[in-house]
């Protein structure tokens, strides 16, 4: 069924908004994936707050121009799916990379990070980076280790002090 001009304009507006708000947008060629694989991909992305859209390339091109990301047009050939990540720029690339290991038909095309466009190789490198949560966990662990060590040392000192006071008390009781 053919879409009306109003529907297309609404889709362009929605896509422009997504491109503007997303931390990252990863473009993939999904040719060769069957319906079950596409549904599984959408489910995995959705579980991590990542939207996945398949929109006509001409509408995507117009939305990219509206969002000030004209460089993406060179990657809009063939069937293109776009994964929009809002919380962490690494998450869409990681999920798509993991999915492509099991489904070789899925191929990276490019990614939009902020207002810059990067090619396939940089997207694959992005997928290898730790996520924001992993980095925060490492930072917290780095801060926690010295604090835990300090707390352990303080407990040791207090324990020794208590033993010393108890020994003095014991001596006084024995002397009386």
Swiss-Prot record:
GO BP annotation list? translation
Recorded GO cellular component terms are:
large ribosomal subunit
What this protein is called in its record is Large ribosomal subunit protein uL10
Disulfide bonds, which pairs?
Answer: none
Function, as annotated, reads:
Forms part of the ribosomal stalk, playing a central role in the interaction of the ribosome with GTP-bound translation factors.
MF terms (GO), sorted A to Z:
large ribosomal subunit rRNA binding; structural constituent of ribosome
Q: Which gene encodes it?
A: rplJ
- Coiled-coil stretches, from where to where? none
- What's one Pfam family the UniProt record gives for this protein? Ribosomal_L10
């Amino acid at each position: 069924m053919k879409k009306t001009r109003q529907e297309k304009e609404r889709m362009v507006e929605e896509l422009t908004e997504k491109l503007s708000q997303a931390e990252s947008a990863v473009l993939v060629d999904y040719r060769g994936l069957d319906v079950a694989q596409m549904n599984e991909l959408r489910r995995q992305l959705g579980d991590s707050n990542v939207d996945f859209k398949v929109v006509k390339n001409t509408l995507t091109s117009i939305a990219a121009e509206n969002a000030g990301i004209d460089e993406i047009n060179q990657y809009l050939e063939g069937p293109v799916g776009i994964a929009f990540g809002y919380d962490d720029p690494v998450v869409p690339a990681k999920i798509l990379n993991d999915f492509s290991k099991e489904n070789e038909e899925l191929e990276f095309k490019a990614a939009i990070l902020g207002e810059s466009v990067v090619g396939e190789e940089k997207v694959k490198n992005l997928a290898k980076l730790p996520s924001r949560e992993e980095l925060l966990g490492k930072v917290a662990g780095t801060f926690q280790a010295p604090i835990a060590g300090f707390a352990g040392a303080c407990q040791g000192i207090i324990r020794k002090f208590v033993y010393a006071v108890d020994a003095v008390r014991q001596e006084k009781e024995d002397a009386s």
